[in-house]
Structures are given as C-alpha cells and as structure tokens.
C-alpha cells in the first residue's frame, strides 16, 4: 500500500488509490474532521450545492471536503461505474481538489436493497476544520473497500471468490476486506482503538463471521453497523468502511 500523502489545501492526508477516490483520509495537525449526515439521501447534484453552502456558512473552503458516502439505486456494470465516476469527479475538479487523475477524497458508494434512491445520492460528507487545541484523539475516515483486488482488469477477474456466496466463500471475502481495512489504518498511523464505528455493507448472511473474523480483531469496540446494501459494482458482495470523525451531526 502506498504511503499517505498530505493534501495541504484541505488540512488532511490521504492514501492514494484510484481516480474516483482515495482509500482513506486523516486530519493533519491543527485540524480535525467533522461528519455531516443528511436526514435522507439527497440527489448528488443537490447534495454538492448543499455541501458548498454548508462549508461557506462555517467559513471553510471547498478544498476542506475530505470524504463522502453515496447511495446508488443499483450496482453498476464496469463501464457504467467508470461513466458515473468520470461525471462525479468534475465537481471535485471545480472545487480545486481533483487534478490529473489524483483524488484525495475518500468515498463509500453502496446500493440499498430496500428504500433505494431513484438516482445516485449523497448520504453524508466529511470535512476538516481548524482546531486551536491539541487533538484528544486522531480523526479520520476510511473509504469503502470491497471484495476485489486492485488493478485495471474487469471486476469479475479481480473479485475474491467470484460468485461464491457459500459460508467459506464469504469467509474469504470478509477476511480479504478486513485485512485491507487494517492495512489502511496502519498506513494512516491508526488502529482499531481509534475507530468510532465500523460499517459492513452486504445482503449476504455473514452472521457466522461477525465474531471470529470481525469482532475478534477489535473492530467492534465502537460498534459494528450492518447496512443491508450491496457494493456499487455487479459481482461484489461485501464492503466495509471505518469512521473516526470527532463530531457527527444531521442536517
């Protein structure tokens, strides 16, 4: 995994990943991360306007935008995901964040099985704010990570235990993803003790794995939240992210 890179205009560091998102972010000294959740997911174009308005109201630049959580109607095919992401990053480019296919903003994008939005929408977002006192604890947000290895091959060629939702197939997927989360935490100089909450995103029955493969590692100290959703690309079955904001509010 690459080393974290400082995004000075935003007051945070990030783990480089792909053009559509980074693998995670953490506040730099002198800053901390706040998370804002919409009461219900807001269509993406409207949400970006709301984010700009919120940041302006608290005196923060758009470059302080560090992470977001999206909800989409259904999983994309490979090309559909590329097309969506190409459109998504245009706003980040306008905000002075995204440039030359480098994107410091972390992101989770999942698809609810029920109560799904009619269009890709934003559920929550995070940003940095300056602090004048020493941080009581580090603040960070990890991007959603699914059961696919990195690379440029089609997803079906990279998905761990592709098409296998047997108990052992799911175990292989869950272990792969949680080890990825642990690697990201380590890269940011963090551990499970720093997490506020850990989120699971799947419609598969992973109850037999929560104890031995998840809670046993320490990721449940702040609570494990199981979202009955699917990852954003057809064929993926399991995703996780980890939150560590210092404050969370609901608009």
From Swiss-Prot:
Cysteine residue modifying agents such as p-chloromercuribenzoate and the SH-binding metals Zn(2+), Ni(2+) and Cu(2+) completely inhibit deaminase activity, whereas Ca(2+), Mg(2+) and the histidine residue-modifying agent diethyl pyrocarbonate inhibit the activity by 23 to 50%. This is 2-amino-5-chloromuconate deaminase. Pathway: Xenobiotic degradation; 4-chloronitrobenzene degradation; Xenobiotic degradation; nitrobenzene degradation. Involved in the biodegradation of xenobiotic compounds, such as nitrobenzene and 4-chloronitrobenzene (4-CNB). CnbZ preferentially catalyzes the deamination of 2-amino-5-chloromuconate (2A5CM) to yield 2-hydroxy-5-chloromuconate (2H5CM). Also able to catalyze the deamination of 2-aminomuconate to yield 2-hydroxymuconate, which spontaneously converts into its keto form, 2-oxalocrotonate. Keywords: Aromatic hydrocarbons catabolism, Hydrolase, Plasmid. GO terms for molecular function: hydrolase activity, acting on carbon-nitrogen (but not peptide) bonds. Its EC number is 3.5.99.11. It comes from the Bacteria.
